[in-house]
Amino acid sequence: SFATTLCSQESSTLGLPDFPLDSLAAAVQILDSFPMMPIKHAIQWLYPYSILLGHEGKMAVEGVLKRFELQDSGSSLLPKEIVKVEKMTENHVSQASVTIRIADKEVTIKVPAGTRLLSQPCASDRFIQTLSHKQLQAEMMQSHMVKDICLIGGKGCGKTVIAKNFADTLGYNIEPIMLYQDMTARDLLQQRYTLPNGDTAWRSSPLVNAALEGKLVLLDGIHRVNAGTLAVLQRLIHDRELSLYDGSRLLREDRYMRLKEELQLSDEQLQKRSIFPIHPSFRIIALAEPPVIGSTAHQWLGPEFLTMFFFHYMKPLVKSEEIQVIKEKVPNVPQEALDKLLSFTHKLRETQDPTAQSLAASLSTRQLLRISRRLSQYPNENLHSAVTKACLSRFLPSLARSALEKNLADATIEINTDDNLEPELKDYKCEVTSGTLRIGAVSAPIYNAHEKMKVPDVLFYDNIQHVIVMEDMLKDFLLGEHLLLVGNQGVGKNKIVDRFLHLLNRPREYIQLHRDTTVQTLTLQPSVKDGLIVYEDSPLVKAVKLGHILVVDEADKAPTNVTCILKTLVENGEMILADGRRIVANSANVNGRENVVVIHPDFRMIVLANRPGFPFLGNDFFGTLGDIFSCHAVDNPKPHSELEMLRQYGPNVPEPILQKLVAAFGELRSLADQGIINYPYSTREVVNIVKHLQKFPTEGLSSVVRNVFDFDSYNNDMREILINTLHKYGIPIGAKPTSVQLAKE
């Protein structure tokens, strides 16, 4: 009766989604095996109202629960942990008997299992058991008995790791499928491809193959997909049946057997008529981020979606558990720094202030692990700079930046006092001696490249800021991180990367994204040979195969649903290419599978992006994927080092002119940072002016400067500001007789 109440007219006017009646049978099955479990808890799985609804909705649902006496009297007997898992095979169906401890009793249930041998629970080396995770896995085991699961949790909190560990416990092979926004039903089930002779044929997608082979499918990012596309999966999830586009049908095992007996046909004959059985242990785990309460755009958890899965919410780790995880993963991290860092992070996570919460999002567990890895490797490093780097505080809006500084000061994380001294270039040297490279205090062995052609070599004048950035990059590079450089246009991101790879002697593959980049063009490049279309590997695939460094430029221009594909590549080393091949991380997974590309151990990715915000009109790449990469903010050089650099570009240009230019541009940049002018003038423009003056020394300064500023002369306000600033430093652009100001007597 509780369920029918929620499906009635009145509750839909309250804006509550309908209750999934179909899932009740499954829930009753679980409660039958575990009679001591609270009913309210099982209802949360079917109908996760605490994440779905705002405050009013929650109160309404809890009122209904009280009315039907389903609100238990506080005796919460929840499953504690999985005690043991044993494999059993009855007539070719692999199952496992799992013993789960609830309160003081142990209950044994049968669940479907995978085709591999089981690993003992908590045997996986990379997974650290904490109390809440043990409990979550035990609950997932209960749902796994009857239905498919959907894990909901914020980004970077370890959903994928839990799902992987769950699969290992039951001996499943995993088939990860990354979902993106413009995915069609065809991408999920079957795609067209062209045979060499020009015929078109259907190729089954990884999802269909997994259903036939009995794997565990991970649908990652189910909150992104269009709801209509997911409706295709409803039949597969509810009835375990599927009709494909080429006319073949997949049936549930028992129906397939009955059909076989009725028609007295063998398996081969049925396969000729394209009827296939779905493997009995096939299961789906969907991973999603929680819906945003109150917004209309992100309500992906609708009534038709609620019937498909059992929902488990993954809470963020409590402080003690997070310390446990970090300490076991990074054993020699300095204790004092770790305590400060965690108390700071949890304080940010618990505040009600929205700006502080947006900062906390960029300090996920994944990011904290990265910071502690660096601290354990370089213990004298400053914690303040590590946190500001993780949040990219250089490009935060002023409100958020001041909130960050205030919270850091409260947590007694201070700025290093030596940082205020102007560092000298002679302290930081880039030198290559007998096969090792030293940048500042960090040294690395030089790579022995097979392809000398692809090692970049550019004109680069050392200046202190760029060398400091490169030293920082080298630290992370040696820790095995993928790098992300964020900065305004023209500050020399490409130059720094090319110089960095030149010093390390690493070959480079280069790919530039744009607004129309799709997932297909990232992985394949079509070209025409002898009148036939031939698909060649894109630089991305080449870099993965040969172990080169992939430089992804303008990463913020591509739609974020495309760049999400990079996430699985960086994190798990897995990715499906547009022609059906797949990239895998370790060669152990290859045995007997064709169409597999193994990642070369030397493969790295360096991503370049502009800062999010107005004049660049990019997507917020940092917001969606920032916590996967190790981030570095690149800025214009300080006036002193910029002057040094310009002297090298224009040795014959008179010194006073260079000083005028540096001072004027310095002021224009600070105006851009305050938001008075839109376009942040960068080093690139000054260098171009100086190059011009070097080549044509007779031309007047004002006419050369106009090459850069003419674009803004149509906008009168901008023009006023520009002319005033340039006059201040004695660059006579657009001067009229009236602007000559005589000194007073």
Regions found by a protein language model. Give the residues of each.
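Conserved catalytic/switch belt of AAA+ P-loop NTPases
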Residues: S1, Y193-T194, L216, V225-V292, ...
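Conserved nucleotide-binding/hydrolysis micro-motifs of P-loop NTPases
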Residues: S23, C157, Q181-T184, R224-V225, ...
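Conserved alpha-helical scaffold flanking the Walker A/P-loop in AAA+ ATPase domains
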Residues: A138-M141, L195-L218, L265-F276, E471-D476, ...
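Walker A/P-loop
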Residues: M145-Q181, V232-Q234, D239, H482-L513, ...
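AAA+/P-loop NTPase substrate/partner-engagement loops
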Residues: T169-G198, L503-G531
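Phosphate-binding P-loop
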Residues: S132-H133, M140-V146, K155, N209-L212, ...
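The Walker A (P-loop) glycine that initiates the GxxxxGKT/S ATP-binding motif of P-loop NTPases
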Residues: G153, D220-G221, G487, D553-E554
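Alpha-helical lid/collar subdomain of P-loop NTPases
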Residues: S1-T130, K134, A138, P280-R283, ...
